[in-house]
Amino acid sequence: LSLNLYDVNKSLLSASMLLVAASSLYAQKAKVEYRGQAKIIDIATITPTGCIMNMNDKETFFEGKCVVEFKAIGRPTERFVLKEKERLNITFIKDENKKQRSEIRIEEVQLTAKKKQFSEIEIKQEALQNLQSFSLGDVLQQLPGQYVQPFDNTQFKNIVFRTASGASITGSSQIPGGDGYGNKAFGVQLMINDVALSNNENMQSYDSANSSPFGLSFNTSNRSGTLTPAQANYGVDLREIPTENIESVEVIQGIPDAKYGDLTSGLIKVNTIAKESPLRLDASLREGTYQLGLTKGFRLSKEQALSLSFDYMNSISDPRTSLVGYDRITTNALWSYNKSRFRNKLSFSFSQNTSNGKKDPDDLDGMVINVNNKSFSLSNNIRYSFGGASKRSWFRSISADIGVSYASQFTERKYWLNQGARPYGTSTENDVYYASYTPPSYENTAYADGKPFNIYTNISTEGNYISKSKWSHSYSLGINYRYGDNFGKGRYGTAGQFATMSSVGDSGSGMRDYNYRDNVLATTQYAFYMQDNITKRFANKHVLRANVGLRYDIQNSASTFSPRVNTYYQMGKFTIRGGVGLTSKAPSLNQLYTGPRYFDMLLGDYRLPGYYSAAIMQTVVTPGDNSDLNPSRSWKTEIGLDYRFSFATINITGYYNKLLDGFTTMAIPRVMDKAKVNVNITGTEIPTFEITGTEKFNYLQNRIVNGYESTDKGLELMTSFKRIESLNLVIGFNASYTETESIKDASILTIEKPKIIDNNFQYGLYNDTKAKNTVARASFSFDYHLPASGLIVGLRTDHFLIDKSFTSENDIYPVGYIDYNLNRVMIPDANRKDQLYQNLFRKRTEEKLSGLKNKTLHNVHLRVTKDFLSGFRLSVYVSNVFNLKPYNEDGYVYSNFTTTSFGANISYRF
């Protein structure tokens, strides 16, 4: 089946025109009292000239010498001229259909992401629908520095802020890995209704003892696409968060309040509410993905409400083969109770996420990944406000946020091996023994079975105080507790699941079964914090606000003091902002408890077909856990300027973030006493052996340590234009420029074995190679909004201005060496080029520049949404509407560029 792009675009244009033509009108009725007469009129907008609207508990009115105009689409303008001391009263008539009215029909509805007081960005109302959103990750693509990603729901999605380390949100373009991206993604905290959603207990990996802390596990690629399930150490998989019941999303890329901890990159706050709402059915379709959603809100009583939602999503990377797929089932129940001083919000959630891989009939050795995750969570937000509020309400309220989550995670990896019978290590202690053999051909399988459990608790008290000089203080004191564990069966699999030996003398890192329940200890985090939000309004109408906080964390016995300050000074239309703060992120269970490290060496392999196969293996066991890991830390600094023009508000923010003690890999030299064996062979009997002595054998093993550093600095611009009433047009613009430099700590040196054997040097020591990434992106949004017609036609542009990745040349001269006794010797700087060390000189690698280089790329995306009074709502989404081609300066396809694709969403409110 082939589609003609011209016909498709023509059809979309026709559909857009049809939606415009099908518009219907709406205005609110009000009773207007003027000069002793009352009149019922329709009001959509009120335009006063010479006075402002006054409101109190009883009425709304205009007073004084002025002109007031009431407008409604399709109605004549009502104009009232008031003289001195005359008054015009307005009483809005209760709209019986208000509950059924869509937000799209409200003129003031938020259409774009908005900056709040400091550098927080809020997305709510129609802004949540700017992009076709199957999950929270899609919603966040409209933030500054982000972009519309190539569509693919078979790979895990997470996000990083204000960094040039890899792609912003993972997509089919690439799977960012490495310490740079990994530390930033791991440092993002996601909270739903002020309860942390944790991935710290995820241990779904199969070689954490030997691999990088941010190595990818259980992922595979074939001709139908790439399947990558949720990964340990990378933060929460945003695919698991549907948007059905989200009320608003707030993103803090800068300095968070002292209440929030266990983060280094940023904070995402998702808010959901329980309210009465009609039954709504949603259906979405895009490429190989479809989604069904059902929501309903009930008003149980005047004080109580209950919201229920159900969501199902099925995604196939390539519908022609169905070899790679992802399914999500989510149910949510939210109950709220609000009465006078007492508020309570109780939430329950169940979700099942499965990643399904199928065997490619044309790839006999292809790898298949299957994942089945089920999770349960229960959270409660409770708040009690004390009576007698005054200027000095020392204890105005007390609140508690409590969450418990439990998940069952099962991951399977399997592929066919046909390499002949090979010996593999099985011992779990230091030993020389007869090794087992794999079958000549067999299906190799590896499993990870996890049962992560998490508790989150935050208890705080709030109060306020106004001094005699009118300084307002709104303060809070709180304690925070986190508990994490994993009760799963752990890692296990078939024979030779990780490493086998093909010839005598072969050696390598082995793998053994590792039970989480028996070996993993729970992690705990305690925190105490205090925050004072200070506000002062001066006589000249200038406003000063400062949020000052201090947090003390005890994370797995490591303590951190985190001062945090956000402040702004407003002078009319001009505001200057600034902030500085320290945050920290505790290591995950998967980084702390890796299991022992096994080093296997094949000493002998003797086979007599039909009689025996005898492999002599030596195993050396090294303790593998990293209980001495400390939290990573990040100093965050920013300064900003805001200015309100008559036509727009401009926000400029400069930031400088320094990550310290990030998680990375360090090579550790080891020495073993390699056994010398004497083998006795007698006829057809199984050979016997005896150990006659030992000799030293050196090797390297990896270990996770604190030692990664990076610096992110850049500028961020957001512009919110005032609605152009004559065109019904809302314009938004954002842009960002970021430079990221990264390197391992000076104490973590690169260790390499010399190419030429030297009796004096076992290994050479070299400085780590520096890397610098630079990214600049911009985005425009144009939303044509007819609220009375329930119509939005939106265009969003993505501009890839700079995308450069620069890797400097390697350090060819050693800074030190390790001798055969594993003694580390440092070389003075003046002697590094001495010919004595010529066998340690490395081959020079050239500087490398990759990315777009000097080319820029631009993309355009379309959204058309129409709301019908009958209850139907239809949205059409087109990515890369002009079918632009994404080639970089070298003529290669730029993988971050979204190709043309079509999607639609239809919903019905009963």
Language-model features: where?
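Outer-membrane beta-barrel transmembrane domain signature of Gram-negative proteins
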Residues: 428-544, 592-595, 762-768, 809-811, ...
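N-terminal periplasmic "start-of-domain" segments of outer-membrane beta-barrel proteins
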Residues: 47-59, 104-139, 143, 156-160, ...
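N-terminal periplasmic accessory domains that precede
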Residues: 87-96, 136-139, 157-160, 191, ...
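Gram-negative outer-membrane beta-barrel transporters
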Residues: 538-540, 656, 677-809
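Outer-membrane beta-barrel signature, preferentially recognizing the C-terminal barrel domain
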Residues: 584-660, 679-689, 694-722, 771-774
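C-terminal beta-signal and adjacent terminal beta-strands/loops
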Residues: 219, 659-661, 799-844, 854-910
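Extracytoplasmic beta-strand/coil segments of soluble accessory domains associated
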Residues: 137, 141-221
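Short, acidic, small-residue-rich periplasmic hinge/interaction motif at the N-terminus
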Residues: 29-49, 71-75, 87-129
